[in-house]
């Protein structure tokens, strides 16, 4: 990028669209393997600093978080010996091979596989002809560890890079609240919150997702950690219908801990209004069904939904349900999903832990 007087401004990846340039550097430097090695080395140092890399009970973390690590358009998650790399821009897709070489150089023998997973994240997919696949190795080992709990990672068909690593800290917090409670995990996907609740001492855990594949994966992950444990049951049902039916049948369970972690209701600003209606409706149903003294963990992962937007939707839901509610915790993404101070939009995950009278 140059000024009208041909003075240097920045170097970045160009593509046609709403974001035409993703800036990689404001220094006049070459974007080559050495450039990526330096950025990746700094990113790794950050993860060592915050204590998520090289832990015996945790081999899962985000190494690169796009703009937060000064590598816009690139996400890299580490699952034990496998790095899952995802491009969100054409330029980063074109650089995928030198990024992979840089990653091998920086990580040395701590990774043996690099899986490239960008089919669903790239624009102009037809023109690029992109297919997911290994850039290094080819291991089919799919079990990773987070805070001592094991789970399967579906590199090929799973959402994002295969697991929602951004909820690690929030899952740990949920574990502390689970002892003796009857837990409902809505939009469970891989069941992460469910098996943390089980380890925390929950007396019953129900996992709900509209996708049968998600239910199968949840059951597999629960079995991996708690084989033959009768406390868990999973249901392939619509979330709103499931909430409506709570307490409708004699002897059916009620819940005193509910997790609401839906997929993004809005991916662009035009969808914001309907998204906020969705969050209000969802939370209202949870407020209406939870038992007195219950706890709700509620989240939004929509970047266009601000903290104030989300809080207002939740507060409106509480008022409509006629429940008295206290905020116990305000939640966000973990430290391995850093936010560049010049890119506040990187703060996408927001959540609340609520006590409901």
Where are each of the predicted segments found?
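C-terminal catalytic and target-recognition region of SAM-dependent MTase-like enzymes
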Residues: 254, 295-357
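Conserved SAM-binding loop of SAM-dependent methyltransferases across substrates and taxa
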Residues: 190-203
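Conserved class I S-adenosyl-L-methionine
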Residues: 180-189
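Non-catalytic accessory regions of SAM-dependent methyltransferases
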Residues: 1-80
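S-adenosyl-L-methionine
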Residues: 211-259
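Non-catalytic substrate-recognition/targeting regions of SAM-dependent transferases
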Residues: 64-77, 93-164, 172
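Conserved SAM-binding motif I beta-strand of class I
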Residues: 204-209
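Mobile active-site "lid"/loop adjacent to the S-adenosyl-L-methionine
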Residues: 255-285
